[in-house]
């Protein structure tokens, strides 16, 4: 294609198929590449927000699958990630609640990986495994993400794309307080991959849980999941942000009485 042009008017008229409202579509920031297609969330005005793909042509721009007929199945589309020949995302099919899905770009190859939270809510609907602020990233051989199985709260999980290979990595905050997900419990954020490792920030500061802020690293195993820098040793910490991998080094900024640059190879001194 030469020049600069709109690929396709997915939802003719107004509102558009892509907006800055996460419940209607997506912002232009949220585009994911798999093979020679770009994947994104869009609403054509009929099917709700679903997974779409485009090869850069109008005829090659299409909905991958209507996951939730009439309801819009795609959820939290700003945390999609790609591993091997599949794109991973969260979706609600109207039966299982919001769960982990994957797609190879075909209708038949778009499927739920595992129903992580099988609990039934008082409303009669299925519980969601994913909150609106869950995180997800890809290492060299797995997807690392946060999820709630209804027992441990929002915690650290991994998947290789199979139900059997989808498992809890570690309960970072044992008991009723989760390590991730809600303002009244701990929160995980800034998840960033480096080779076969994933780095992330945990802020555990809720009623009943001790105040603890730390940068963590994980290789997808319990023994390989630990804090590389924490408020116990650093003193006052207000935040840890800016996780950026360069080669085999992860850089991040620790805030608290000023901001300081840190670097880690994933080990503790």
Q: Language-model segments: which ranges?
A:
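Feature 14080 marks short, conserved micro-sites in well-ordered regions
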Residues: 1-269
């Amino acid at each position: 294609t030469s020049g600069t042009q709109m690929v396709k008017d997915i939802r003719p008229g107004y509102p558009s198929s892509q907006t800055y409202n996460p419940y209607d579509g997506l912002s232009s920031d949220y585009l994911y590449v798999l093979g020679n297609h770009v994947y994104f969330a869009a609403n054509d005005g009929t099917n709700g927000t679903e997974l779409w793909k485009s090869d850069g042509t109008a005829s090659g721009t299409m909905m991958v699958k209507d996951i939730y007929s009439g309801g819009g199945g795609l959820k939290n589309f700003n945390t999609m990630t790609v591993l091997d020949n599949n794109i991973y995302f969260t979706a609600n099919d109207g039966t299982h609640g919001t769960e982990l899905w994957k797609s190879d770009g075909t209708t038949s190859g778009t499927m739920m990986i595992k129903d992580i939270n099988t609990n039934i809510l008082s409303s009669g609907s299925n519980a969601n495994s994913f909150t609106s602020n869950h995180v997800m990233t890809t290492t060299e051989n797995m997807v690392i993400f946060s999820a709630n199985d209804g027992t441990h709260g929002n915690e650290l999980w991994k998947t290789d794309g199979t139900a059997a290979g989808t498992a809890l990595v570690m309960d970072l905050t044992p008991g009723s307080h989760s390590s991730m997900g809600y303002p009244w419990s701990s929160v995980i954020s800034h998840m960033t991959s480096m080779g076969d490792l994933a780095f992330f920030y945990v802020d555990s500061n809720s009623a009943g849980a001790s105040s603890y802020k730390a940068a963590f690293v994980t290789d997808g195993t319990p023994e390989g999941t630990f804090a590389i820098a924490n408020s116990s040793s650093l003193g006052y910490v207000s935040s840890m942000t800016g996780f950026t991998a360069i080669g085999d080094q992860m850089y991040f900024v620790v805030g608290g009485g000023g901001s300081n640059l840190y670097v880690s190879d994933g080990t503790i001194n």
